[in-house]
From Swiss-Prot:
This is ATP synthase subunit a. It comes from Metridium senile (Brown sea anemone). The lineage of its organism: Eukaryota, Metazoa, Cnidaria, Anthozoa, Hexacorallia. GO terms for molecular function: proton-transporting ATP synthase activity, rotational mechanism. GO terms for cellular component: mitochondrial inner membrane; proton-transporting ATP synthase complex. Mitochondrial membrane ATP synthase (F(1)F(0) ATP synthase or Complex V) produces ATP from ADP in the presence of a proton gradient across the membrane which is generated by electron transport complexes of the respiratory chain. F-type ATPases consist of two structural domains, F(1) - containing the extramembraneous catalytic core and F(0) - containing the membrane proton channel, linked together by a central stalk and a peripheral stalk. During catalysis, ATP synthesis in the catalytic domain of F(1) is coupled via a rotary mechanism of the central stalk subunits to proton translocation. F-type ATPases have 2 components, CF(1) - the catalytic core - and CF(0) - the membrane proton channel. CF(1) has five subunits: alpha(3), beta(3), gamma(1), delta(1), epsilon(1). CF(0) has three main subunits: a, b and c.
Amino acid sequence: MGAAYFDQFKVVDLIAITNSSMMMMLAVAVALILLKGNRLIPNRWQAVMESIYDHFHGLVKDNSGPQYFPFVFTLFIFIVFLNILGLFPYVFTVTVHIVVTLGLSFSIVIGVTLGGLWKFKWNFLSILMPAGAPLALAPLLVLIETVSYISRAISLGVRLAANLSAGHLLFAILAGFGFNMLTTAGVFNIFPVLIMVFISLLEAAVAVIQAYVFSLLTTIYLADTIVLH
């Protein structure tokens, strides 16, 4: 029974491409459909999206510059739609796979590093040596800062996959428990229904929060390297 909870994370080949690839394409398609079209008088959905847009625009502009806003906002939309789609029954959740999340995080850190080297040349390596530190401690500090810099990519990807995996497992266990209570106590017992509704709302909140944290940390890493804070 316990092994069945992990079957939702299994990568399956479908028509020469995996379910993981199909979900990524579906997330992009759904995002394009839901985000297209602007009305002069916005409806509630457009008002929510404009609020999110304004928030991210201000966040990225203040920390790393407006030129990076399209990338960070697109990253947030992509991850949040992947996370939300994964909440539906029998839908594969791409972001629970460490290979996918580490691929995203390492691509971001490598891209940021190359951008910093292109902009600052060898002066970019000054981020590995804290300002005002004693010269005698330079070898140790450079080693520590190098390990810390590399660990950014690892922690960024692992955090997303681990939190979503734990949430989905908890959701599956409690949903199964609630369904058993529902069939045992009768359809008029509201308690198991409330359990499933609460867990669903909690998982939706976690899906959005984790996408936001991933995008926020990406913005911070951009600020630390591109602006050389």
